[in-house]
Swiss-Prot record:
<keyword id="KW-0808">Transferase</keyword>
<dbReference type="InterPro" id="IPR006222">
    <property type="entry name" value="GCV_T_N"/>
</dbReference>
<dbReference type="Pfam" id="PF01571">
    <property type="entry name" value="GCV_T"/>
</dbReference>
<comment type="subunit">
    <text>The glycine cleavage system is composed of four proteins: P, T, L and H.</text>
</comment>
<dbReference type="GO" id="GO:0019464">
    <property type="term" value="P:glycine decarboxylation via glycine cleavage system"/>
</dbReference>
<comment type="similarity">
    <text>Belongs to the GcvT family.</text>
</comment>
<dbReference type="GO" id="GO:0005960">
    <property type="term" value="C:glycine cleavage complex"/>
</dbReference>
<dbReference type="InterPro" id="IPR022903">
    <property type="entry name" value="GCS_T_bac"/>
</dbReference>
<dbReference type="GO" id="GO:0004047">
    <property type="term" value="F:aminomethyltransferase activity"/>
</dbReference>
<dbReference type="InterPro" id="IPR006223">
    <property type="entry name" value="GCS_T"/>
</dbReference>
<dbReference type="InterPro" id="IPR028896">
    <property type="entry name" value="GcvT/YgfZ/DmdA"/>
</dbReference>
<dbReference type="GO" id="GO:0008483">
    <property type="term" value="F:transaminase activity"/>
</dbReference>
<dbReference type="InterPro" id="IPR027266">
    <property type="entry name" value="TrmE/GcvT_dom1"/>
</dbReference>
<keyword id="KW-0032">Aminotransferase</keyword>
<dbReference type="InterPro" id="IPR013977">
    <property type="entry name" value="GCST_C"/>
</dbReference>
<dbReference type="InterPro" id="IPR029043">
    <property type="entry name" value="GcvT/YgfZ_C"/>
</dbReference>
<dbReference type="Pfam" id="PF08669">
    <property type="entry name" value="GCV_T_C"/>
</dbReference>
Amino acid sequence: MSSTELRRTALDATHRALGATMTDFAGWDMPLRYGSEREEHVAVRTRAGLFDLSHMGEITVTGPQAAELLNFALVGNIGTVKPGRARYTMICREDGGILDDLIVYRLEEAEYMVVANASNAQVVLDALTERAAGFDAEVRDDRDAYALLAVQGPESPGILASLTDADLDGLKYYAGLPGTVAGVPALIARTGYTGEDGFELFVKPEHAVGLWQALTGAGEAAGLIPCGLSCRDTLRLEAGMPLYGNELSTALTPFDAGLGRVVKFEKEGDFVGRAALTEAAERAASRPPRVLVGLVAEGRRVPRSGYRVVAGGEVIGEVTSGAPSPTLGRPIAMAYVDPAHAAPGTEGVGVDIRGSHEPYEVVALPFYKRQK
């Protein structure tokens, strides 16, 4: 795909004026970094960062049977989500393979917003549309209806509070409420993908530039800086958060990924993948699959996705994500490994980096957890 064919967000000119390095991400021309990705990472951990996430896929589901449709289409119990709250869940194939991981916001009694990963938005839209047959509910593609800005980091509550009258103190994690930010109508959600406190702001695209400028101005004294997708990846890696295409795929069920807790068998009615996921749960209980673990380098060489994890001359797993960790000061990775080598502190584990078996320490995820 040539750069002329890439989709651009409402903030594209802003990113270019800031000197951003742009990259093709799931068909979108997105900012990878503005300067030093390490500085952007540290800003989010210690102060605040501002992200353009307008490539994410918003899908609205409305109607008298919206909850019933989502309970059938997704593996979670969406009917128990109260208005103003959100839930992390997944959509699976009939064979249990993960199509995507999602956040579902209940906006009103009979209105939900499903937020899919950019790379899977069309797949999720098609699946929900197909699964809506027979339900009194409408599935609407709202990807062009929203721009999405995220303010993440310990200073984000104070920065946002200076621009809104919304009750941020009462806004819990995984909750969202309509409000006005810098005069702009927004859905204000206390969600994020960095391991820090923060907010995601869904607004009309025509309001994105003004809101970005207002947030930049309000955050200047607190040290807020614009941040690209590169540091977003290292932030989520430190926080032990899975990325679709790395830790999650159609080849894995939620139980294979260690995320069986998102599957709610107790909910009323059937749901797509129930039979296969029941078998997957039984398999995982009797013969645990490979386990997702953290790996911390003893040296300086950085592992990458697809590198083999080894022990005793045998391949025992595969790296799914790897990068230098600005917080730990050493390379880190997430990897699926055999259960026998998954316990934190397991000795003799290494990563095959271009023929050299580099020693790595097995640790529990996440690598980083913020102090609340």
